[in-house]
């Protein structure tokens, strides 16, 4: 595929009316090149973050094991109890202060292999995250594979 693209580009350059000195050499062109993404250090995830729509304030921290976890600090849900928890003993606890995501491992610029507890339905899902800017991240919660999930964009709290 790449050879065909280069051959086509070379043929077009050789038959075009553009003077030879004005045509860029093929080695300097970016035919089919994807833009480079900024990469962020592993600890860029740590800190306080607003969920999408600023519904909740979360604290992301690195654990002693080197993995990351997310703690609910505040927002619309903070005073509610964990009434949908599958463990009846946990249903009286307040949501504020609970770990809702855990086991996030930094790998190839993303945080993967994590789990997310959703207090709205009492179920646990898979989760992955990626820092997309100095003050933004994208989170994806899913079942089995990331294709079967939902994404949210979070904003760093100041």
How should each PLM-predicted stretch be described?
Residues 126-139, 146:
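Short, compact, well-ordered microdomains
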Residues 8-16:
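Bacterial N-terminal signal peptides
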Residues 46, 52-126:
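Central antiparallel beta-sheet cores of small beta-barrel/beta-sandwich binding domains
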Residues 1-7:
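Bacterial N-terminal signal peptides that target proteins for export
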Residues 136, 143-158:
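Edge beta-strand at a domain terminus
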Residues 35-48:
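N-terminal helix-cap/turn-to-beta initiation motif at the start of protein domains
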Residues 18-33:
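Signal peptide processing junction and immediate N-terminal pro/mature segment
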Residues 63-65, 130-134, 155-157:
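A short, sequence-level motif marking secondary-structure junctions
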